[in-house]
Amino acid sequence: METRINTVIPRDRIGALIGSEGTVKDRIERAFDVRMTVNSESGVIELLPNEGNNDPVSLLKAKDVVAAIGKGFAPEKAFILFDDDKVLDVLDLRDLFGRSETDIQRVKGRIIGSEGKTRRMIEEMTDANISVYGHTIGMIGGYDAVSTAREAAEMLIKGKQHATVYKFLRIKRREAKKKMTLELWEKPPG
Protein backbone atom coordinates (compact mmCIF):
# COMPACT_ATOMS: atom_id res chain seq x y z
CA MET A 1 0.00 0.00 0.00
CA GLU A 2 1.30 3.40 -0.97
CA THR A 3 1.64 6.05 1.71
CA ARG A 4 -0.11 9.30 0.96
CA ILE A 5 -0.95 12.45 2.87
CA ASN A 6 -3.86 14.74 2.12
CA THR A 7 -4.14 18.29 3.40
CA VAL A 8 -6.44 21.18 2.62
CA ILE A 9 -5.47 24.81 2.04
CA PRO A 10 -7.68 27.81 1.26
CA ARG A 11 -8.48 28.13 -2.43
CA ASP A 12 -7.07 31.67 -2.49
CA ARG A 13 -3.63 30.21 -1.58
CA ILE A 14 -3.54 27.66 -4.45
CA GLY A 15 -1.86 30.17 -6.78
CA ALA A 16 0.91 30.81 -4.24
CA LEU A 17 1.39 27.03 -3.79
CA ILE A 18 1.70 26.37 -7.51
CA GLY A 19 3.70 29.51 -8.29
CA SER A 20 4.45 31.11 -11.62
CA GLU A 21 4.52 28.34 -14.24
CA GLY A 22 4.50 25.73 -11.44
CA THR A 23 7.88 26.74 -10.01
CA VAL A 24 6.89 26.54 -6.32
CA LYS A 25 5.16 23.16 -6.71
CA ASP A 26 8.15 21.80 -8.67
CA ARG A 27 10.60 23.02 -6.04
CA ILE A 28 8.67 21.30 -3.23
CA GLU A 29 8.39 18.07 -5.26
CA ARG A 30 12.15 18.05 -5.99
CA ALA A 31 13.21 18.99 -2.45
CA PHE A 32 11.26 16.16 -0.81
CA ASP A 33 11.15 13.62 -3.67
CA VAL A 34 7.33 13.62 -3.73
CA ARG A 35 4.47 14.05 -6.20
CA MET A 36 1.86 16.67 -5.46
CA THR A 37 -1.67 16.67 -6.85
CA VAL A 38 -3.57 19.94 -6.43
CA ASN A 39 -7.36 20.13 -6.66
CA SER A 40 -7.91 23.85 -7.18
CA GLU A 41 -11.69 23.52 -6.75
CA SER A 42 -11.67 21.94 -3.28
CA GLY A 43 -8.21 23.02 -2.06
CA VAL A 44 -7.24 19.39 -1.36
CA ILE A 45 -3.53 18.69 -1.83
CA GLU A 46 -2.40 15.08 -2.12
CA LEU A 47 1.24 14.20 -1.46
CA LEU A 48 2.72 10.86 -2.53
CA PRO A 49 6.33 9.67 -2.34
CA ASN A 50 8.11 9.15 -5.65
CA GLU A 51 9.13 5.60 -6.48
CA GLY A 52 12.21 4.69 -4.46
CA ASN A 53 11.55 7.32 -1.79
CA ASN A 54 11.25 5.32 1.43
CA ASP A 55 11.61 8.32 3.75
CA PRO A 56 8.26 8.97 5.48
CA VAL A 57 9.64 12.19 6.99
CA SER A 58 9.88 13.71 3.51
CA LEU A 59 6.08 13.53 3.17
CA LEU A 60 5.60 15.19 6.55
CA LYS A 61 8.09 17.96 5.76
CA ALA A 62 6.43 18.57 2.37
CA LYS A 63 3.07 18.74 4.16
CA ASP A 64 4.49 21.38 6.54
CA VAL A 65 5.69 23.52 3.61
CA VAL A 66 2.28 23.22 1.91
CA ALA A 67 0.53 24.04 5.21
CA ALA A 68 2.77 27.09 5.74
CA ILE A 69 1.87 28.46 2.30
CA GLY A 70 -1.77 27.72 3.11
CA LYS A 71 -1.44 29.71 6.34
CA GLY A 72 -0.37 32.82 4.45
CA PHE A 73 3.41 32.52 4.30
CA ALA A 74 5.11 33.53 1.07
CA PRO A 75 6.68 30.47 -0.58
CA GLU A 76 10.22 31.80 0.09
CA LYS A 77 9.43 31.98 3.82
CA ALA A 78 7.85 28.50 3.74
CA PHE A 79 11.02 27.14 2.10
CA ILE A 80 12.81 27.83 5.41
CA LEU A 81 11.17 24.55 6.45
CA PHE A 82 13.46 22.68 4.01
CA ASP A 83 15.99 22.92 6.86
CA ASP A 84 15.49 20.02 9.30
CA ASP A 85 16.13 22.35 12.26
CA LYS A 86 13.12 24.54 11.42
CA VAL A 87 9.54 23.95 12.51
CA LEU A 88 6.04 25.23 11.76
CA ASP A 89 3.66 26.01 14.60
CA VAL A 90 0.09 27.19 14.10
CA LEU A 91 -2.18 28.79 16.68
CA ASP A 92 -5.82 28.43 15.65
CA LEU A 93 -7.77 31.30 17.17
CA ARG A 94 -11.05 29.37 16.71
CA ASP A 95 -9.83 26.93 19.37
CA LEU A 96 -9.78 29.84 21.82
CA PHE A 97 -12.70 31.99 20.67
CA GLY A 98 -14.95 29.61 18.77
CA ARG A 99 -16.53 31.33 15.82
CA SER A 100 -16.59 34.81 17.40
CA GLU A 101 -15.29 36.83 14.47
CA THR A 102 -15.06 40.03 16.55
CA ASP A 103 -12.79 38.40 19.16
CA ILE A 104 -10.63 36.85 16.43
CA GLN A 105 -10.27 40.21 14.64
CA ARG A 106 -9.44 41.97 17.93
CA VAL A 107 -6.70 39.47 18.80
CA LYS A 108 -5.29 39.51 15.26
CA GLY A 109 -5.07 43.30 15.57
CA ARG A 110 -3.21 43.01 18.89
CA ILE A 111 -0.71 40.55 17.42
CA ILE A 112 -0.13 42.57 14.26
CA GLY A 113 -0.03 45.86 16.17
CA SER A 114 -0.14 49.38 14.83
CA GLU A 115 1.30 49.34 11.28
CA GLY A 116 2.67 45.84 11.93
CA LYS A 117 4.94 46.95 14.78
CA THR A 118 4.12 44.13 17.20
CA ARG A 119 4.47 41.36 14.63
CA ARG A 120 7.74 42.89 13.43
CA MET A 121 9.03 43.14 17.01
CA ILE A 122 8.20 39.48 17.72
CA GLU A 123 9.94 38.45 14.47
CA GLU A 124 13.06 40.53 15.17
CA MET A 125 13.39 39.48 18.81
CA THR A 126 12.83 35.75 18.19
CA ASP A 127 14.20 35.23 14.65
CA ALA A 128 10.89 33.52 13.81
CA ASN A 129 8.69 34.40 10.84
CA ILE A 130 5.04 35.12 11.62
CA SER A 131 1.95 35.08 9.44
CA VAL A 132 -1.45 36.26 10.66
CA TYR A 133 -3.93 34.87 8.14
CA GLY A 134 -7.61 33.98 8.41
CA HIS A 135 -8.21 32.59 11.89
CA THR A 136 -4.62 31.38 12.40
CA ILE A 137 -1.24 32.64 13.50
CA GLY A 138 1.59 30.71 11.85
CA MET A 139 5.19 30.72 13.06
CA ILE A 140 8.28 29.36 11.29
CA GLY A 141 11.79 29.17 12.73
CA GLY A 142 14.02 27.22 15.05
CA TYR A 143 12.28 25.39 17.89
CA ASP A 144 13.31 27.91 20.58
CA ALA A 145 12.41 30.88 18.37
CA VAL A 146 8.96 29.50 17.57
CA SER A 147 8.37 28.58 21.21
CA THR A 148 9.17 32.15 22.33
CA ALA A 149 7.06 33.66 19.51
CA ARG A 150 4.13 31.45 20.51
CA GLU A 151 4.49 32.46 24.15
CA ALA A 152 4.49 36.16 23.16
CA ALA A 153 1.38 35.65 21.00
CA GLU A 154 -0.37 33.82 23.83
CA MET A 155 0.45 36.69 26.21
CA LEU A 156 -1.18 39.13 23.79
CA ILE A 157 -4.18 36.84 23.39
CA LYS A 158 -4.61 36.78 27.18
CA GLY A 159 -4.67 40.59 27.17
CA LYS A 160 -1.19 41.39 28.49
CA GLN A 161 0.04 44.91 27.77
CA HIS A 162 2.24 45.27 24.69
CA ALA A 163 5.01 46.79 26.86
CA THR A 164 4.97 43.65 29.04
CA VAL A 165 5.31 41.43 25.97
CA TYR A 166 8.16 43.58 24.57
CA LYS A 167 9.98 43.31 27.92
CA PHE A 168 9.46 39.52 27.89
CA LEU A 169 10.90 39.38 24.35
CA ARG A 170 13.96 41.47 25.32
CA ILE A 171 14.65 39.14 28.27
CA LYS A 172 14.28 36.04 26.07
CA ARG A 173 16.55 37.61 23.42
CA ARG A 174 19.22 38.30 26.05
CA GLU A 175 18.95 34.72 27.35
CA ALA A 176 19.26 33.32 23.81
CA LYS A 177 22.36 35.42 23.11
CA LYS A 178 23.94 34.35 26.40
CA LYS A 179 23.15 30.68 25.64
CA MET A 180 24.65 31.01 22.16
CA THR A 181 27.81 32.64 23.54
CA LEU A 182 28.21 29.89 26.14
CA GLU A 183 27.74 27.20 23.48
CA LEU A 184 30.46 28.80 21.35
CA TRP A 185 32.90 28.75 24.26
CA GLU A 186 32.01 25.21 25.34
CA LYS A 187 32.38 23.56 21.93
CA PRO A 188 35.23 21.06 21.96
CA PRO A 189 37.92 21.67 19.32
CA GLY A 190 37.72 19.71 16.10
PLM features per residue range, with description:
Residues 1-190:
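RNA-contacting regions in translation and RNA-metabolism proteins
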